[in-house]
């Protein structure tokens, strides 16, 4: 019968060195909080029970745990450590959330080691069960050339087995020189752990219940103690302040980018490319410098992203090109082109082979296949059919100061530059609009819509009103002459409007 496994994630600390109103475990890197990274790794073990121990700002951390419970699709019990009395006490609180008759392996990890992955936890469990006689405790260790801040692994001189873990504050000078250190990740036999926790005391420099003392208790009881040595120490590096967090974020990103490159993605400049862990990329995607792919962004085969592009929760179809664009919660169809300097706000859907060009902003807009919005246009709360073309400097006027309304433009529509769509309004299939048209009423299919009065030219206006200027001289050279026979109404026009 397979051995049951429970995972206890410690997330109760205050994290004062972050100097933040946000709990330490809710600071983010790679698109997830540190807590989320830890729970994702724990879930990969497929434990029978998953417990998070909360304490500082427990309500806020508890809400985050509940959200992750839905995201991971598995129950996560919450145990509360009201008084921060050391790691031993925290694990004791965690065990209280398990069934009283639970038998098996208890994995203990921390919520501030975001690079720890499920494979490492699997390896720890395998090591814990590797000998015929089950281990009471298996400790994950690593070698730290600069071991400051870590508990030291003290081994027996005659056989090299672990004798105890000594916290730095309690270490002798000789023990402080040891470079093998405790990673803070353990596998315990559940029955032994319950017994050992009851034997802990606070007779130490910190006045706390150390979980590490369980190792010494096991050794004194003659119970087996194993060690699993981790070569990749970055996986268990903690983030206690923002400097450490930024370093871990950079290391996580480096690993993420390199993994995608090995999977067939071209990243022209890895040093300026940031990819969240929730992003998915198909093979033969090309990413140019200065790109951020965030959240759950997904990019299809042969798409080209960048340079200087940020996409958050955006789906990009095969063969699309997205250049110098900022987009969020949008969909870009296969073969579409976007940019440069486009802004895709939430709810934008661009169909296959469509185009959003320079200085185009879209929001809550469904734009059909092969439709082009080439430049200098705002498209908000709109539906545009296939094979249409929206002229430059057009605006979908969707807000009347109280409510937003929708514009519907059909297929094969051609609109002149500077068309204003005053919503709610509909433009039928195959319709045209003249340049500068303000659409306040529906346009039937196949119609040409124009608006505005007849153009009037007032001859000689510059010479009369701007004499001696370069414009007047240029006009004179072009053969224009002062006109003295203006109609009285034209003079009034000048007085009332044009000169103003």
UniProtKB/Swiss-Prot annotation:
What is this protein for, i.e. what is its function?
A: Catalyzes the last two sequential reactions in the de novo biosynthetic pathway for UDP-N-acetylglucosamine (UDP-GlcNAc). The C-terminal domain catalyzes the transfer of acetyl group from acetyl coenzyme A to glucosamine-1-phosphate (GlcN-1-P) to produce N-acetylglucosamine-1-phosphate (GlcNAc-1-P), which is converted into UDP-GlcNAc by the transfer of uridine 5-monophosphate (from uridine 5-triphosphate), a reaction catalyzed by the N-terminal domain.
Q: Does the keyword Nucleotide-binding apply?
A: no
Pfam families in the record, alphabetically?
A: NTP_transf_3
Where UDP-N-acetyl-alpha-D-glucosamine binds, per the record, is at 10-13, 24, 81, 86-87, 151, 167, 182, 240, 345, 363, 378, 389
Positions with a binding annotation for Mg(2+): 112, 240
Residue positions binding acetyl-CoA: 392, 398-399, 417, 435
Species: Rhodococcus jostii (strain RHA1)
Query: What pathway does the annotation place this protein in?
Result: Nucleotide-sugar biosynthesis; UDP-N-acetyl-alpha-D-glucosamine biosynthesis; N-acetyl-alpha-D-glucosamine 1-phosphate from alpha-D-glucosamine 6-phosphate (route II): step 2/2; Nucleotide-sugar biosynthesis; UDP-N-acetyl-alpha-D-glucosamine biosynthesis; UDP-N-acetyl-alpha-D-glucosamine from N-acetyl-alpha-D-glucosamine 1-phosphate: step 1/1; Bacterial outer membrane biogenesis; LPS lipid A biosynthesis
Task: Provide the cofactor note recorded for this chain's UniProt entry.
Answer: Binds 1 Mg(2+) ion per subunit.
Q: Where is this region: Disordered?
A: 472-500
The protein's location, in the record's own words, is: Cytoplasm
Q: Gene behind this chain? A: glmU
Q: Quote the catalytic activity from the record.
A: alpha-D-glucosamine 1-phosphate + acetyl-CoA = N-acetyl-alpha-D-glucosamine 1-phosphate + CoA + H(+); N-acetyl-alpha-D-glucosamine 1-phosphate + UTP + H(+) = UDP-N-acetyl-alpha-D-glucosamine + diphosphate
List, as start-end ranges, the regions of compositional bias called Basic and acidic residues: 482-500
SUPFAM superfamilies to which the protein is assigned, alphabetical: Nucleotide-diphospho-sugar transferases, Trimeric LpxA-like enzymes
Oligomer and partners: Homotrimer.
Ranges for the region named N-acetyltransferase are 264-500
Task: Report the active site residues.
Answer: 375
According to its UniProt record, the EC number is 2.7.7.23, 2.3.1.157
Cellular component terms (Gene Ontology): cytoplasm; membrane
Q: Where is this region: Pyrophosphorylase?
A: 1-242
- Cofactor(s) named in the record: Mg(2+)
Protein name stated in the entry: Bifunctional protein GlmU
The keyword Phosphoprotein is assigned to this record: no
Keywords of the record: Acyltransferase, Cell shape, Cell wall biogenesis/degradation, Cytoplasm, Magnesium, Metal-binding, Multifunctional enzyme, Nucleotidyltransferase, Peptidoglycan synthesis, Repeat, Transferase
Q: Which Gene3D superfamilies match?
A: Hexapeptide repeat proteins, Spore Coat Polysaccharide Biosynthesis Protein SpsA, Chain A
């Amino acid at each position: 019968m397979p051995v049951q496994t429970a995972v206890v994630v410690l997330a109760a600390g205050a994290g004062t060195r972050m100097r933040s109103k946000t709990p330490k475990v809710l600071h983010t890197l790679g698109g997830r909080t540190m807590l989320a990274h830890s729970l994702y790794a724990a879930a990969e073990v497929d434990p029978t029970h998953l417990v998070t121990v909360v304490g500082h700002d427990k309500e806020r951390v508890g809400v985050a745990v509940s959200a992750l419970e839905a995201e991971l699709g598995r129950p996560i019990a919450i145990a509360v450590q009201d008084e921060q009395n050391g790691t031993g006490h925290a694990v004791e609180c965690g065990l209280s959330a398990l069934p009283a008759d639970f038998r098996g392996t208890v994995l203990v990890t921390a919520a501030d080691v975001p690079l720890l992955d499920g494979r490492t936890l699997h390896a720890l469990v395998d090591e814990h069960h590797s000998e015929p006689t089950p281990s009471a405790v298996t400790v994950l260790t690593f070698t730290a050339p600069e071991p400051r801040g870590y508990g030291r692994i003290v081994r027996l001189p005659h056989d090299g087995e672990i004798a105890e873990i000594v916290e730095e504050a309690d270490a002798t000078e000789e023990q402080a020189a040891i470079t093998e250190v405790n990673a803070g990740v353990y596998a315990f036999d559940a029955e032994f752990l319950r017994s050992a926790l009851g034997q802990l005391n606070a007779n130490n420099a910190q006045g706390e219940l150390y979980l590490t003392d369980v190792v010494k208790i096991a050794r004194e009881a003659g119970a087996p103690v194993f060690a699993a040595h981790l070569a990749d120490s970055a996986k268990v590096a903690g983030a206690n302040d923002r400097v450490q967090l930024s370093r871990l974020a950079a290391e996580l990103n480096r690993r993420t980018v390199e993994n995608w490159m090995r999977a067939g993605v071209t990243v022209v400049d890895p040093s300026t490319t940031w990819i969240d862990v929730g992003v998915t990329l198909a093979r033969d995607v090309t990413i140019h410098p200065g790109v951020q792919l965030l959240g759950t962004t997904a990019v299809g085969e042969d798409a080209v992203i960048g340079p200087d592009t940020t996409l958050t929760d955006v789906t990009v179809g095969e063969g699309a090109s997205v250049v110098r664009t900022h987009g969020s919660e949008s969909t870009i169809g296969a073969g579409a082109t976007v940019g440069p300097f486009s802004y895709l706000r939430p709810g934008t859907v661009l169909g296959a082979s469509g185009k959003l060009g320079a200085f185009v902003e879209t929001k809550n807009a469904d734009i059909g296949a092969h439709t082009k919005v080439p430049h200098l246009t705002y498209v908000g709360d709109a539906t545009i059919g296939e094979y249409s073309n929206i002229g430059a400097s057009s605006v979908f006027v969707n807000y009347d100061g109280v409510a937003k309304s929708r514009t519907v433009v059909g297929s094969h529509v051609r609109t002149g530059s500077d068309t204003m769509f005053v919503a709610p309004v509909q433009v039928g299939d195959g319709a045209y609009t003249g340049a500068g048209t303000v659409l306040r009423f529906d346009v039937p299919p196949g119609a040409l819509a124009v608006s505005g009065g007849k153009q009037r030219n007032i001859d000689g206006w510059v010479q009369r009103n701007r004499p001696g200027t370069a414009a007047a001289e240029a006009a004179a050279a072009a053969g224009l002459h002062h006109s003295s026979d203006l109609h009285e109404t034209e003079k009034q026009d000048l007085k009332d409007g044009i000169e103003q």
